[in-house]
Regions:
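Hydrophobic, small-residue-rich transmembrane alpha-helices and their short perimembrane loops
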Residues: 1-74
Length: 74
């Protein structure tokens, strides 16, 4: 197995773990905040969606980087 292929796999795998965990924690805490204060649901939901989009951008960037590394290997 080529070490470059291993590096591409690790770049994608490890790069997606962080945003995945972050979005999970963000959703849990946002649901908890809405449960405690239902009047602020709109503001909390807006911030949650914005934060999830930014975190997902990092995951997509990692995925694209892995694809670029993989095509460079071939």
């Amino acid at each position: 197995m080529d070490t470059a292929a291993l590096a591409a796999g690790l770049a994608v795998g490890l790069g997606v773990i962080g945003p995945g965990l972050g979005i999970g924690i963000l959703t849990a805490k946002s649901s908890e905040a809405i449960g405690r204060n239902p009047d602020a649901a709109g503001a909390v939901r807006t911030n949650m969606i914005l934060g999830a989009a930014l975190a997902e951008g990092l995951g997509i960037l990692s995925f694209v980087l892995g694809i670029l590394l993989w095509t460079k290997i071939r």
